[in-house]
Amino acid sequence: MSVVSTETLNRRIAAATGIVMASVLLSRILGFFREWTVAHQIGSSGVTDAYYAAFTLPDFLNYLIAGASLSVTFIPVFTKYAAENREDEGWHVFSTVVTVMGVAVVALVILGEIFAGRIATLIAPGFNPGERTLFIFLTRLMLPAQICFYEGSIFSAVQYAKGRFLIPSLAPLIYNTGIILGGVFLSSRYGITGFAVGVLGGAVCGNFLLQIYGAHLAGARFKPNFNIRHPGFWLFIKLSVPIMLAVSLSFADDWIIRWFGSYLQPASITWLSYGKVLMRVPLGLVGQAIGVASFPILAQLYSERKFEDLNRILNSTFKGLIFLLVPISALTIAQSQPLVHLVFSHTRLHEADLQATAATLAFFSIGMFAWGAQYIL
C-alpha cells in the first residue's frame, strides 16, 4: 500500500472519528443529564444503590454477548467475505448469527429472570431486605433490554462494515433519552422504577428498531436460518470466545464496586456510579470514538493481509489516543471537585455526597488512559 493510500485511510478514520465523537459527546451530555435527573428526582440513598446495582447482571450479558464482543468480531468476518467478492455468503453468515445467537441470548435472559434472586446474593450481599427486593425487581425489569442490545449490535456491525456510522451513533442518544423521559414522567408516581422502564424503552427504540432500519439502508439481507455448520459461523465463534472472555473481565470492576458498596453506608454505590459516569465522559469522547471509527479499517487491512499497513495505522492511532487522554486525565483529577459541584449542585445531593463523588471521580481518572487503550487493543 502506498503512502498516499495510507494517508487516505487515516483521513477515513479521522472523518469517521468525527461522526462518532459528535455522537459520543451528545451521548455523554445526555448521560450527564440522565444522572442529574436521578439525583434531582430521587437523590442518593439505598433506593438508588438498588437501581445502579440492578444494572450488574444485564451489563454482564451486554459485555459478554452484545455490547462489544459480537459486534466487534462480526466486522472482520463480514469484511473477509466482502474482500473476497463473496458478499452473498457474508449475508448468509449474518442471518445465521442473528438467528442462532438471538435464540441463545433469549435463553440467557430467561435464565436470568428465573435465577435473579439467587444471583442477587452474589452481586450485592450486603443489601437489607428492602433494598434486595427492589434490586431483584429492577434487574428483572431491565434484563429483556439485552435482547435489543444483542440484535442491535449485529445490525450496527453491518453498518460499520459498510462505512455507515451515523445511525449506529444515534443508538446511545435515544437510549439515554429513554431513561431520562422515563424518570421525568414516571418517577413522580413509580419512583426509581420509572428510570428502569426508560431503560427498556430506550433500548427497544434506539438499539433495536432504529438499527434494523439502518441495516436495511445499508443493504442488509436477512433470512432466518440455523446453518451452524457454515464455516463462517464457526469463524465468528472462534473470534468471539477470547474477546468475550476479555471484555467480560472489564465487568469485574462494576461487580467489585457493587459487592463491596453493598456493605458500606447507604448511597455508597451511587457515589461510585456517579464518579465512574463522569470519568467516562472524556474517556468515551476520545477512546470510544477512535476505537469504533478505526476498527472497520483495521479489520479490512487484516482481511487483506496487509500487516505492515495495519501496524502503522494501529501504532499511530494508539499514540494519538494516549497523547489526548493523559493530559485529560490529569485535568480531570485536578478539577474533580468543581466538576462534580457543577453537575450535581442543584440536585437533592448533599455536600457529603458531592465530596464523596468527587473523590471517586479523581480515583477512577487515574486509569483513564488504560481504559482508553482497551477500546483499540
Language-model-detected regions and their locations in the chain:
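Membrane-embedded alpha-helical bundles of multi-pass transporters/translocases
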Residues: 1-377
